[in-house]
């Protein structure tokens, strides 16, 4: 056990967060995301919500200052977003510093970013459009 590391962060996730360099991206996905078929390393975090994991990792993770560090999937035409999902994520990400803007991109553009991500963390999140991409920055 390590002191001050949340027990929600598995050893595998902790290793991945440490191995990521600035500019690398990680996705925290909902339970329905097609992570296995997209290619990068997949980490299971079944039973945990995305917001709980964000709250756990943000004290350890510097967000990028040079490019938009937060990306979520936009709703497909004719569908709607639940604003409470983004609000929960913003709340979790605001623990260390003000939360940067979240950029929304279409579903297929998000999948393309996911293919290039350092890792995808599949959670137990059931919220529709509950996926978020974080771009790692340089530690001060």
Swiss-Prot record:
What metabolic or biological pathway is this protein involved in? Carbohydrate metabolism; L-fucose metabolism
Catalysis performed (reactions): alpha-L-fucose = beta-L-fucose
Residues at the active site: 22 (proton donor)
Cite a single Pfam family from the UniProt record. RbsD_FucU
Family that this chain belongs to: Belongs to the RbsD / FucU family. FucU mutarotase subfamily.
Complex and partners: Homodecamer.
Question: What protein name does the entry list?
Answer: L-fucose mutarotase
**Underlying gene:** fucU
